[in-house]
Amino acid sequence: MLLRVYQKVQMPSREQLHGEIILLWLFMVIVIRNNKESTGMIYEAIKKLVKYGLDTGLITEYDKIYATNQILEVMGLDEYEEPAEEPGDIDLEAVLKELLDYAHETGVLAEDSIVYRDLFDTKLMNCLMPRPSEVVAKFWDIYNHKSPKDATEYYYKLSQDSDYIRRYRIARDMKWTTDTKYGTLDITVNLSKPEKDPKAIAAAKLMKQSGYPKCQLCMENEGYAGRANHPARNNHRIIPITVNGSPWGFQYSPYVYYNEHCIVFNGKHTPMKIDRAAFVKLFDFVKMFPHYFLGSNADLPIVGGSILTHDHFQGGNYTFAMAKAPIEKYFTVPDFGDVEARIVKWPIAAIRS
């Protein structure tokens, strides 16, 4: 019976076998060619990212090979052939998208959501970043030999070039001005990051502090790789300053509501408190950076709109409508005769000196 079954099986002819072998060979050629093209394209993207680092001054020619190898490691690659063609102008968002898509296709980037893509591309950008000590040394060298304004311009550009401040997302924000009886007001709708919920802010203030970093304003965020519920800060650099005799940090907000929107924060994880010392801290900062303003959110959860668990202020290089609003009344304060105070025409109580 087995013999009869075997006899009924029709063996493929020599011509059929030959045809199938050719088809298999063609399939393998196509796969190899596609892999080569894909690898070649990713090499081009890597070269573009390195050129971006050179063009922006994040790295020098001496850093080129090192930066390339760091990018290869993040991408899960162990070899590289530099493309002969020199890239033109670099669109950072497009280059990062190409690298992220490839990383997801090859399994290096497991999840293809915005959270995990942001975690991954921040690692890529860190391959181009100078160490914190280099940034700090250059900042204070410019501060001491040129001016505070030149120092902050260097640091702000670095924060943008590093993609810590994502220019292409900030560009989507809606901004306009409107004339009112209080003057011309600035209206902004931040689309790069949603506003905090007041209830969540209040709950956060009551929660027992744990974890690492304890919050998004802690010094320990510098260089932190991030996680699903905490943003990556591999490419983040902080400038250490002294405020009211204590160590503080100076950085820019990654979500920039206005020009050079900065955050000045306590070196220790301590709650916000508006008291006399808060005003001393404000004046200390503007003495160091006279071209900046500095202010504080309310230390109340309903109206603060801020991280109340960490003492900090916000400022920048911008003139708001409140600073230009008309004056309703002048007055002096006893024991401070050299200070002229003014009641400002504003929808809430406001005094300007």
Question: Where is each model-derived feature located?
Answer:
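Conserved His + Asp/Glu catalytic blocks
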Residues: K273, F293-L294, L300-S306, N317-S353
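Histidine-centered divalent-metal-coordination microenvironment in nucleic-acid enzymes
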Residues: N259-N266, V303-F320
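Helical scaffold of the NTase/Pol beta-like nucleotidyltransferase catalytic core
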Residues: N235-R237, H269-L294
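Low-complexity, intrinsically disordered or signal/transmembrane-proximal segments
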Residues: Y6-Q10, Q16-H18
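Active-site microenvironments that recognize anionic phosphate/pyrophosphate groups
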Residues: I32-P271, K345-I348
